[in-house]
Amino acid sequence: DLHSQRRRQRQMCIRDRHTPDALKNSIVESKKLETSNVHVLFGCGGNRDRKKRPLMGKIASKYADKATVTDDNPRYENPARIREEVIGNLKNISEIGNRKLAIKKAISELKRGDLLLIAGKGHEKFQSIMGKKFPFDDVKIAEKYLQKK
């Protein structure tokens, strides 16, 4: 796994997970740890297999204690539409398009014993939007907000 950190009994894992099976396995394995709740924050890339989006939403909804959908690499697609396809008619998934704000909020809501699984981008150092690559590092952003927690 790319990155794992524990601070004041709150845990965070950042993993490169882009398929329904990988997301499910990560959540299920995380729940085996000594954690109170597993929160998953994830997104689906644009211009990729659209059929897996609703599957990933259903998996997060079913296996995580809390799930938030955010933007990954929307590429040339409308990020709001990607999130909509992930969520569908599921009621227990929240949506925050801005990935940095989504990470900040997820960390701020962690309680003692909780684990936050940030899935999707993993080791990537950029976010691809409309043909441009913007600097973005899940690890650095998450560490920044975890330090403040």
What positions do the PLM features span?
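ATP-dependent carboxylate-amine ligase
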Residues: R8-Q11, D16-K149
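Short, exposed "boundary/linker" segments that immediately precede the start
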Residues: D1-H3
